[in-house]
Amino acid sequence: MDVRRKVAAIGPNFDPDILEATRALYVPLIGKPSGPVKVTADVAYGSDARQKLDVYQPAALSDRVLVYIPGGGFVGGDKNSDGVFYVNLGNYFAGHGILTIVANYRLAPAHPWPAGSQDVGSVIAWTRANAKSFGGNPDRIILFGQSAGATHSAGYLFDTSFQPSGQPGVAAGILMSGPYSFQGELRPNLKAYLGSDQMKYAERSPLTHVSKNRTPLLLSVAEYDPAFLAVPTYELARAVTLRDGKSPKLAYFAGHNHVSTVMSFGTAQDDVGSAVREFVASVA
């Protein structure tokens, strides 16, 4: 596929220009959903303007609910920034019969740690309370975060202080290409969220809390994730393996960069989509 060659030419790098270049590659490739989808947009789950979510409802009842928390470098990102991304994700999974929720959350620097993971908790609480009214099963929620969204999702999954009664209220988690441990001098966007006190970074790292929760996980990394975004997934996989005595499910997406994974939903390049659907279907 020509898009694979173009992504490979970009290489293991990521910055705003690469984000836009990858977006331009995938916009023309997005197709229509494979089944009828009803969209309910901008549902409030909190009082802040950013605390909104979109619901993508399949035609039939859904035994599983996918909740997606997008990336954006802690200071940006949106559930529907341009009418394409991440509408493509909602349409793709709902078109395959999975009730899907795509949520925004509060951003740094106005809303530093722990706002992201707190908002994930609020999204999950809203989903548990409302899934049935959209034809979904609140007992089979799969939380899916990518990049900064994976950090916020991991923070919620592992740190019981963000969970009602110390339980995450989800059946499984998908963590894609996120940073999970922080130390030393951070990039400006990370510092905007985590603050400047390096003594607090360990406690604010999801990896620190991994022993507190055993929710089934799918971890993933892209071939062209830069090292600072790829290594944390392997560190998390190591910690989960030591905790459980066995490896978590770990996906390696060849030919993808940091964002082409989630931009490929709804295109003919279905490797990431089929892997996520297979994991969702496996959730008991």
PLM features: what roles do these ranges have?
Residues 122-189, 201-202:
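Primarily recognizes the serine-hydrolase "nucleophile elbow" in alpha/beta-hydrolase
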Residues 226-235:
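Conserved alpha/beta-hydrolase "acid-adjacent" motif
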Residues 63-73:
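Short beta-strand element of the alpha/beta-hydrolase
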